[in-house]
């Protein structure tokens, strides 16, 4: 330790030359630090055991927190693995001996590989998995055109959003689709080979009304007609209108009869208010003339024989005067209404 020795020499020389600067300080007070002895856990266990009066005869081995038994694998041969057994020969090359998990596997190993579960649940995966896009409308509002491509999602994101990626919330939302259509009367090869688009000509945009496909959900189709020119300079036919058929002028020799229309008689139903039911009145009620309704009369079930005077005394029925009625003409109809006497308190 030469460096340490030189340092000691320098300190001694400096203390001898300038003791007021390099001398030891006089007011060095040594602090009294109290060392706390850490109480061991064994002492607490011994104290608790002595307090409970339980004596442990044997010392137990330290237990693991998780009792891991390992991967339970059935002895099912892994698909594509060849096993060669030649009795009497020993494997000379130990590194060539395959491991147990390499030869045998679970019975659903192919399903695990397809679903990326079990021993295949490692590595990088897609953020969203395989998303299935379903077009909401496959109708063709232009019958003269035929679809060449399927409906593809229209990229409407900006360049910065494309770098960062699509947001997680935007995957479940609706996205616009695009589909290329060509005229039916032209061959697809002619359209693709002799197609020439002039960027100076603005395309014709036609916005169609919203088509309802589900409750609270609609699809709006926007037709963008791009004018296309051939190599010869002629404008190609984009959408052909149906050709009008000519009507042949001919003479009809058979006589023409007007069609006979069978008319059914219309049934007329009377007003419900004018229909009165058949009803039976109580014997104490005098029927009003002009209205339906009869007084209730008891049917004679057996021929009554004339007997002598009965002991029961019957009261004589008072002869009621006929009801006073009055005729009222209302809307050309004559109504027979009973005359009513009001209470003196009623005006």
Curated annotation (Swiss-Prot):
Any one biological process term the GO annotation gives = viral release from host cell
Briefly describe its induction.
Answer: Expressed in the late phase of the viral replicative cycle.
Entry's Gene Ontology cellular component terms: host cell nucleolus; virion component
The record ties this protein, via InterPro entries, to:
Adeno_V (IPR005608)
Listed A to Z, the keywords are:
DNA-binding, Host nucleus, Late protein, Viral capsid assembly, Viral release from host cell, Virion
**What does the miscellaneous comment read?**
All late proteins expressed from the major late promoter are produced by alternative splicing and alternative polyadenylation of the same gene giving rise to non-overlapping ORFs. A leader sequence is present in the N-terminus of all these mRNAs and is recognized by the viral shutoff protein to provide expression although conventional translation via ribosome scanning from the cap has been shut off in the host cell.
**Subunit text:** Monomer. Homodimer. Exists in equilibrium between monomers and dimers in solution. Interacts with the histone-like nucleoprotein; this interactions bridge the virus core to the capsid. Interacts with core protein X; this interactions bridge the virus core to the capsid. Interacts with the endosome lysis protein VI; this interactions bridge the virus core to the capsid. Interacts with the peripentonal hexons. Interacts with host NPM1; this interaction might play a role in virus assembly.
Q: What is this protein called?
A: Core-capsid bridging protein
Give the organism, scientific name.
Answer: Human adenovirus A serotype 12
Gene name per UniProt: L2
